[in-house]
Amino acid sequence: VRGSPRRPGNAENTGENREGPAMRTTIDFRTLATAAGALALSLAAVLPAAADGEVNIYSYRQPDLIKPLLDKFTAETGIQTNVVSASSGLEERIAAEGANSPADVILSVDIGRLDGAKQLGITQAVASPTIDANVPAQYRDPEGHWVGLTMRARVVYASKDRVAQDTITYEDLADPKWKGKICTRSGQHVYNIGLFASLIANDGADKAEETIKGIKENLAVKPAGGDRDQAKAILAGECDLALGNTYYVGLMQTNEKEPEQKEWAKAIKVLFPNADGRGTHVNISGAALAKNAPNRDNAVKLIEFLTSDEAQEIYADSNFEYPVKPGLEVNEIIASWGALKPDPLPLATIAADRKQASEIVDKVGYDDGPSS
């Protein structure tokens, strides 16, 4: 356990959706051409043409979050980094740019986005013994198109005052004893779709649907807001349990710009679901090599660097995430939540079940809230 994380300022402490808004879980290929064309026109010429000694990065991560890592990479290699940041639309932009795209590396969050980029045909495989040694197979694409860099767990936020138990499973959330006591964001949000896809993979589609429907019926209110809003609702007594990502707890605990969020964090305890069984569902932030990368060798060097021990620790610390490489220490704030036992399910399997998970969410009317 290390001391407090090396913070990149307070930019990451504000805004629930700094990694992109709530979204459906599949790319609408019918409108891709139109959207891609518009993006290409509106965002053209942001990055320079290919040049020796540089790498171009299209990133869904906030600039302040990745700057310390990129500065260190440049200091060690002499390779300059150019970054385009956005909250959405990068995949469509790369597709529109085609063979002339300057994109070398895609930095993204959520397995859905990473696998979606692969399915869109805008990534290419990387064969690297360094990456294979640093990142367990479950956090890598079997064909080498994406690689995980950090993990975040989808946990249960529980009221310290009203929930006595310290263990729970995802399946337990469907128990009628929790009726009217659960809050979540939209079931169609990528974070929940990833979790629900893991239920399909682990329990089978029928059992997963039963669980998702049960959670829906136990909701206190119609799904709304982001993960931090659920902690706020627990403090207000609107619900006792919520689904949320681990890193939001750290962001609330250290939020100096909006100190009221510290009170939200104080109201909850973190329960790691299925810790006594298969383990807790995790998702990743990760990287992919762009299909037409003009600086391919430099791009591979950057991805390899990002999987190194020091880079993973810095990257994870800056946003209260976990390194994907086993055995690396986490900072004291993360350690204070308890031990994480990750579900060993390959993330590629979760990606394959996301479409069905989205269909189940619609089928049970999850986002309509409880029936009564």
Feature locations, PLM:
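Short beta-strand->loop
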Residues: 58-61, 142-143, 158-160, 165, ...
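A bilobed periplasmic-binding-protein/Venus flytrap-type ligand-binding module shared by bacterial periplasmic
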Residues: 157-162, 197, 282-295, 314-315
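A structural signal for short loop-to-beta-strand junctions that line the ligand-binding cleft
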Residues: 101-106, 124-156, 171, 182-184
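Ligand-binding pocket segment of bilobal, Venus flytrap-like solute-binding proteins
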Residues: 191, 198, 203-273
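Early extracytoplasmic/lumenal segment of secretory-pathway proteins
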Residues: 52-115
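Periplasmic-binding protein-like
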Residues: 180-188, 305-329
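Conserved C-terminal helix/tail region of periplasmic/extracytoplasmic solute-binding proteins
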Residues: 343-372
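Short helix-loop capping/hinge motifs at secondary-structure junctions, enriched
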Residues: 161-168, 201-209, 293-299
